[in-house]
């Protein structure tokens, strides 16, 4: 038996109750990511990390984290894509950390998540732009040129 917490808008007290009871009873507890917020057109929403925190608090146990930048994800990406690539994303704390763990450049897509000021900037971006489309030529040029 396992409880896997992934972000969704329908998380409610009944789900929290069932999930935390299962974890307290010994179910494996897995989080897909620990993002505190989720970017939306009208601003930031509570992210999966907020949902995970509720279950962890109620269950008295921390989860295994399966998403970026955790070692299982690093191994999966490396096995699937090899030694060269670029990680693109809007969160230096997860996407930038994944890029660093892989030894790949980080392409930062500016979003409400990065503009909020809540994101740490421990991971320098090799490329920065307002969208993936805006970064495509720079990123492709860097990959082809290296």
Kindly give the residue locations of the regions a language model identified.
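Asp-based, Mg2+/Mn2+-dependent phosphohydrolase catalytic module
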Residues: 1-146
């Amino acid at each position: 038996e396992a409880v896997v917490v992934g972000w969704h808008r329908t998380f409610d007290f009944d789900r929290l109750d069932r999930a935390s009871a299962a974890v307290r009873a010994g179910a494996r507890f897995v989080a897909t990511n620990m993002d505190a917020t989720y970017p939306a057109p009208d601003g930031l929403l509570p992210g999966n990390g907020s949902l995970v925190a509720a279950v962890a608090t109620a269950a008295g146990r921390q989860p295994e984290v399966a998403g970026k930048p955790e070692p299982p994800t690093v191994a999966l990406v490396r096995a699937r894509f090899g030694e060269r690539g670029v990680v693109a994303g809007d969160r230096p704390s997860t996407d930038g950390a994944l890029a660093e763990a892989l030894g790949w450049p980080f392409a930062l897509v500016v979003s409400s998540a990065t503009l909020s000021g809540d994101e740490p900037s421990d991971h320098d971006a090799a490329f920065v732009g307002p969208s993936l489309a805006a970064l495509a030529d720079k990123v492709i040029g860097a990959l082809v040129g290296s």
